[in-house]
Amino acid sequence: MTLIVDLGQSGSRARIDGQQIDSDRGKLNGESVVDSLRAIFQKLPESQVDIAALACTGFNGVVSDPQPFLALCSEFFGAKKVAVIDDGLAGFVGALGGSNGVVLSIGGGVVSVSGNNSHFAHRDGLGSTFGDEGGGFWLGKLGLTRALGIRQGRGDDQVLLSAFEDQVSAFDALKVKNAAEASTLAITSAKNLLAAADAGSPTAIAIRNEGAALLAQTVIATWLGAGGSLDDAPEIAIQGGPSKNPNYVSAIQANISRSLPYAKFVAARGDNLDGAFWIANNMHKDAEPLLRWATKAAQTH
């Protein structure tokens, strides 16, 4: 039996023996990936598995030593093998099923992975402080920042302020304004920013357009990084929470098409859980830096 986990910034999902368990417990700001998984595993039903496939945010494109992950999965589930996977690779495999192209995953953060005849490239995934441009944290932080400023009389965009009414109240309720709860508030505010843009807020539209342009740059850099050219026709899938907003996706696609005119935009065939499951069953060797395996040594008597 195989345990499949998809750990993101805004939540996590696990699949054991066909049963899926969704949680709003994700990787907290400043928390190690192993500590995040331990907190999630404590809430999962007791099970025995042979293999664990862990698709995780927080690696920034370089998967760390898999041995602590093997020890953790062995402790909770008796796992003998573990595949530790950058969430971008899991998203790529799940969405395109091996086709040449780029998968842009937008959650609280941003990760873009391309595959071009077995050459892989990874872009962004740099974390919310210095990267993840155009992602949920980025959108929500900018939107809530401007809403708070407008409330103080620094600007006048009542459409934005109205769209962020609940988020402003949530900010006021924060005991610490720059801790993990504040980061989570920024991520959950992304949908308010996009809704405000849809409602005609000039401030929100400007933020949305900038985010779309930055994400297009990320996609193009990812394709070129895998040895592609601007004359190619890669498949491009855009997935994740903010991608549920059609106007944001359209803006991203329009920006991509200006540089990659033959790009083919496709719907994702599957998600990170599907990708991690496929990797566990088909990619049995390391594909560093995005995939590393660890196997428990056989006991001798």
Regions found by a protein language model. Give the residues of each.
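Short beta-strand-loop/turn "lid" adjacent to the catalytic site in phosphate-handling enzymes
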Residues: 25-26, 42-84, 93-96
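Small-residue-enriched, tightly packed secondary-structure blocks
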Residues: 88-95, 108-112
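Glycine-rich beta-strand-to-loop/alpha-helix junction loops that act as flexible
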Residues: 53-59, 106-109, 234-244
